[in-house]
Amino acid sequence: MDLAAIYKSLLSLSPELPSDLGETESSTSWASSGPWSLSSSDSSLPEVAARLPGRSTSLVEGRSCGWVPPPPGFAPLAPRPSSDWSPSPTSPTATPTTSSRYKTELCRTFSESGRCRYGAKCQFAHGLGELRQASRHPKYKTELCHKFYLQGRCPYGSRCHFIHNPSEDLAAPGHPHVLRQSISFSGLPSGRRTSPPPASLAGPSVSSWSFSPSSSPPPPPGDLLLSPSAFSAAPGHLCRRDPTPACCPSCRRATPNSVWGPVGGLARSPSAHSLGSDPDEYASSGTSLGGSDSPVFEAGVFGPPQPPAAPRRLPIFNRISVSE
């Protein structure tokens, strides 16, 4: 029996087979004619290239303007708005984000040559008409620049937030300028030092200091201004170097020889006479005094001698000397 006759008889006996066969043929035809088939994509490429000459396009970009049916087995997607109505980030209508320093400085190229290659897009001001006032910190240009005054130069130049020249001073009148990170030669962190120093402390004389016996020699006059212990004044009247009519009567009676006299004739610190007569006690206490290593103001240098003050000793050394 012929195979073709058997196939025809089977088709006539089963009624569902033709419908299934038709669905298969329809799905096959949809796949062959749909947008996901190779033949249709190959045939649509010349049309896209003809529509946009001189520009390379992709299959997705060429069909982005219209509706694309989903692939087999997937539900259709919701329609989205066209890309023509969505704002592009590169469009001229988009507002660029400007910096806080925009047009706050003059353009150096425009100031020197009178023209700038950036034109209206330049971030600097082309003339005083475009110059804007920058929002500065409340302490801008109110303190002295530490690096400029100690090293003679500053890496920030004109953009430094601290004062380099007196013309840049924006501080309120009556407020002294402050140098940050002041240096002390005594090894202790000192507080902020005002600049310039007072006129009364500009030139200390040798006779206005009294030195107590210590293992270290007295520092030179230049180091006395930078030591924090040099400004610890004892109770009493403080005399300046040059006698003035407003000073004490003993200063007016003093002669130049007595003002510039030798150091050995000066009164010694009370701590040198207030110690005990025991040599061991003197050796243990002499090195423990906090004020004996640096010069202090002494009352009664030019006036009448004052009674010795109480001994300046730490409590721990008092207990040690008593136990011995």
From Swiss-Prot:
One of its GO terms (cellular component) is cytoplasm. Residues 310-324 are annotated as: Interaction with CNOT1. Induction: By stimulation with various mitogens. Residues 1-15 are annotated as: Necessary for nuclear export. The keyword Nucleotidyltransferase does not apply. SUPFAM superfamilies: CCCH zinc finger. SMART domains: ZnF_C3H1. It holds the Pfam family zf-CCCH. The keyword Transport applies. Disulfide bonds: none annotated. Residues 93-166 are annotated as: Necessary for nuclear localization. Its main location: nucleus. The modification Phosphothreonine is found at residue 90. Residues 101-192 are annotated as: Necessary for interaction with PABPN1. Residues 95-171 are annotated as: Necessary for RNA-binding. The modification Phosphoserine is found at residues 58, 64, 86, 88, 91, 167, 184, 195, 216, 227, 274, 294, 321. Gene3D superfamilies: Zinc finger, CCCH-type. P-P-P-P-G repeats lie at residues 69-73, 196-200, 218-222. Residues 172-324 are annotated as: Necessary for mRNA decay activation. It is found in: Nucleus; Cytoplasm; Cytoplasmic granule; Cytoplasm, P-body. Keywords: Cytoplasm, Developmental protein, DNA-binding, Exosome, Metal-binding, mRNA transport, Nucleus, Phosphoprotein, Repeat, Ribonucleoprotein, Transport, Ubl conjugation, Zinc, Zinc-finger. This is mRNA decay activator protein ZFP36. It comes from Bos taurus. The gene is ZFP36.
